Design a protein with these regions (language model features):
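Residue-level signal for short segments within beta-strands and strand-turn junctions
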Residues: 10, 40-44, 69, 86, ...
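Short, conserved beta-strand segments of beta-strand-rich sandwich/propeller modules, principally
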Residues: 26, 76-81
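C-terminal tail/sorting-segment detector
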Residues: 79-99
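Glycine-centered coil/turn sites that cap beta-strands in beta-rich domains
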Residues: 1-39, 65
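Short, glycine-anchored, charge-dense loop/turn motifs used at functional sites
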Residues: 36-48, 80-82
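Terminal processing/anchoring signals of secreted or surface-associated proteins
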Residues: 8-11, 45, 65, 80, ...
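Glycine-centered tight-turn motifs at strand-turn-strand junctions
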Residues: 47-75, 86-89
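Residue-level detector of conserved, well-ordered beta-strand and adjacent loop positions
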Residues: 9, 30, 52, 66-68, ...
Length: 99
């Protein structure tokens, strides 16, 4: 079952140097089903962004996120909740960002 294998890496995501914010400011959702949506929320329930993962090869895959919200703002330190969903199933988990 794909729901047991979805992960966010790195988790927690920690920015340790100023140059990382420019060049490497992203996390990866791995082991995704080929067609899914990733909804990201703050712990307070505010919608941060929705990512659409589409891999027409049918393989499990990876989707990167640059840590920028749907309002084009950098996200802040905190705990975030994500929901990966397909037409048939979903998984909910969390990840941390430390700046």
């Amino acid at each position: 079952n794909w729901t047991e294998n979805v992960r966010v890496v790195p988790n927690p995501y920690k920015v340790s140097a100023a140059w990382e914010q420019t060049y490497f400011n992203k996390i990866a959702f791995i082991n995704l089903p080929s067609m899914c949506d990733i909804h990201i929320f703050t712990l307070g329930g505010d919608h941060v962004i929705t990512l659409e993962h589409r891999d027409y090869t049918g393989e499990n895959g990876t989707e990167f996120w640059d840590l920028v919200s749907r309002n084009d703002q950098d996200v802040v330190t905190g705990l975030y909740v994500y929901r990966v969903e397909t037409e048939d199933d979903f998984v909910i988990d969390k990840f941390a960002i430390i700046k």
